[in-house]
Amino acid sequence: SVRDQYWAAKYKSWYDAGDAHEINMTMLENFLNMAEPATLQRMHGHYLASGFNTAEEVNGSGQQGPDALSIWWYNRNLRIFNNILRTKPGPEDRILVLFGNGHMPILRHCFYSSPEFRVVELKTLLKK
């Protein structure tokens, strides 16, 4: 659709600009940039803006985009979260989670929502 083409082009330009900028960053600077709420929101938005609600209809339902995103992508992230739970972390354990930025909005939601975890943002761990 025209909408999908528009957003695919927009996100490609954002990714290209980000790649050009990140090449001059240290790994730490890159991780800090990726952890910024605005970056996480923008990257998660790609899943919602491109091919999500304009996907071809299946059986006239018009729900192929949401179904694919929830069945495949949300499931994948819940499995990642579950694998972390399966390590049986204790109350004093610390866990560092490094995943691709596409996973982080959902994983952050899981960790912030779970009473078993207290999330500590990377930037708060750095010495000033």
Predicted features, each with a name:
Residues 70-128:
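A cross-kingdom marker for long, charged
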